[in-house]
Amino acid sequence: MYKTGFLAGISLAVMAGAVTYFSGISMSGAADIDATKVYMTHCKTCHGENGHPTDLGTGLGAREFANAEWQAKTTDEQIIKQINNGTPEKMMPFKEKLTQDEIKALVSVVRGFGKK
């Protein structure tokens, strides 16, 4: 009985691994996301390379991520919500373009600008 249960467990683990591998799903989640690359690809056009808005971003009301007051009063959840939903006529929503792991990883980049 023990052998049968053990073999069934191994079989399930192998099948789960195969499904994960062939579906392209990462088992490590946010751990292997290059958040800086995601930021540079999707955010820097308006928010700038260093978290200081570009001229385009300033015209759209982009946040100054290095602003200590904004950093202190803004929660990670608010940042995630903003990235997901955007702001009409100012910032496009990214919930359809980025994974939730990528969006969560962007929080660390945004927070990093407050430490510089």
Where do the model's predicted regions map?
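Phosphate-binding glycine-rich loops and adjacent basic patches that engage nucleotide phosphates
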Residues: 2-6, 38-48, 65-73
